[in-house]
């Protein structure tokens, strides 16, 4: 079959809720993927940061295969031998009393919202049905009805109403706006991305997260960090919140928690918060399944043992430095932290970020635009300096043709 045949079949039988680049991939290894015709590409999207450990990392795949042959699912109706090991390992890894295992990022966000509201009623003493959670404009936390109810992006929420109440929307990177919102006595939580990924890798001012964290604690409001995309080494530290020395009251993780091998997400909190939910009040058939547990342990061990946070920091500095040296009128701004980066483009002669990504594909590197004019560059954290310089050369040469 030709690439267009695969695409035609997918479009015929699949819902049209994505607009992929016209490339059909068959195999991946490390920082590379190969299409059905055998052409190799640098993967500079990494499954929206889920593939931080690289494609098909041998240690993670080995863990997957060993567990798949032993036991894959029991549901939480019974105990599994590996689940307690996973919970202990990850709680100690990130420094929390408890975790609640889920599968997807959106599920984890929903779980955190429920947990925050429950804490607000049971611990803070907010009147029934009055709890409010503060969120930021231009956020992206998922696609469920409740999550899009706090979105400010029409492509996420338009014509999907009625919407879930209970959210206060404020501008991102604005401490004064948060201070004003927290005057509401019914405010129980502040949900924030340490860096807004889908918005175009928007990095807040230094000190913003710390100031927000301090405000939350002054007002007895939970600080909830959505580190699904920024966490697990992506920004050059284990968590992006580590840059400001803050420990979220509720931490949400996903994506790279499994190294892109299986859907695994988790919500972390201490006992005072987590134990407000009792048996039967929240759950997931697949959440914490043995396969996911084994894979997640291996994925985190890879991050630790291969020093991927440190490599992300070093390679990110290299990438941004080289990008800023490119003299091209289409490059308006380079921003990011670690290996979560973006190039903000300026249209030229009718050419946009989409056209640049098509040209990058032809030259052996795949990346994807966000918001039409921004290209997100997020390679696997295992990338070497030699590989990074080769990829930068592709990007430089591609821009030179525009």
Predicted feature residues:
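Conserved N-terminal phosphate-binding loop of PLP-dependent enzymes in the Aspartate aminotransferase
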Residues: 1-402
């Amino acid at each position: 079959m030709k690439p267009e045949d695969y695409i035609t079949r997918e479009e015929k039988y699949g819902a049209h809720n994505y607009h992929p680049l016209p490339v059909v991939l068959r195999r991946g290894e490390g920082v590379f993927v190969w299409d059905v015709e055998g052409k190799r590409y640098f993967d500079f999207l990494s499954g929206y940061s889920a593939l931080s450990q690289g494609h098909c990392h041998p240690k993670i795949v080995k863990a997957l295969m060993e567990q798949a042959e032993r036991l894959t699912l029991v549901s939480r109706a019974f105990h599994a031998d590996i689940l307690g090991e996973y919970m202990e390992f990850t709680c100690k890894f990130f420094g929390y009393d408890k975790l609640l295992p889920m599968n997807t990022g959106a599920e984890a966000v929903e779980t955190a919202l429920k947990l925050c509201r429950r804490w607000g009623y049971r611990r803070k003493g907010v009147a029934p049905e009055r709890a409010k959670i503060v969120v930021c404009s231009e956020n992206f936390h998922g696609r469920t009805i409740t999550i899009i109810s706090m979105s400010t992006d029409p492509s996420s929420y338009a014509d999907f109403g009625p919407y879930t109440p209970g959210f206060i929307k404020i501008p991102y990177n604005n401490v004064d706006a948060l201070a004003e919102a927290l005057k509401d006595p019914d405010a129980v939580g502040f949900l924030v991305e340490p860096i807004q990924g889908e918005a175009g890798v928007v990095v807040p001012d230094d000190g913003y997260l710390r100031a927000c964290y301090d405000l939350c604690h002054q007002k007895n409001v939970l600080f909830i960090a959505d580190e699904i995309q920024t966490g697990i080494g992506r920004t050059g530290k284990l968590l992006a919140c580590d840059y400001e020395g803050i420990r979220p009251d509720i931490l949400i993780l996903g994506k790279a928690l499994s190294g892109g091998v299986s859907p695994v997400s988790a919500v972390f909190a201490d006992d005072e918060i987590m134990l407000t939910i009792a048996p039967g009040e929240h759950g997931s058939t697949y959440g914490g399944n043995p396969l996911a547990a084994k894979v997640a342990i291996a994925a985190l061990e890879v991050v630790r043992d291969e020093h991927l946070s440190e490599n992300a920091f070093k390679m990110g500095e290299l990438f941004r430095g080289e990008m800023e040296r490119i003299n091209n009128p289409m490059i308006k701004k380079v921003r990011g932290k670690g290996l979560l980066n973006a190039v903000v483009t300026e249209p030229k002669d009718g050419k946009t970020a989409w056209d640049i990504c098509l040209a990058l594909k032809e030259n052996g590197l795949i990346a994807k635009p966000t918001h039409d004019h921004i290209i997100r560059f997020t390679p696997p954290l295992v990338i070497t300096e030699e590989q990074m310089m080769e990829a930068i050369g592709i990007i430089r040469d591609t821009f030179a043709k525009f």
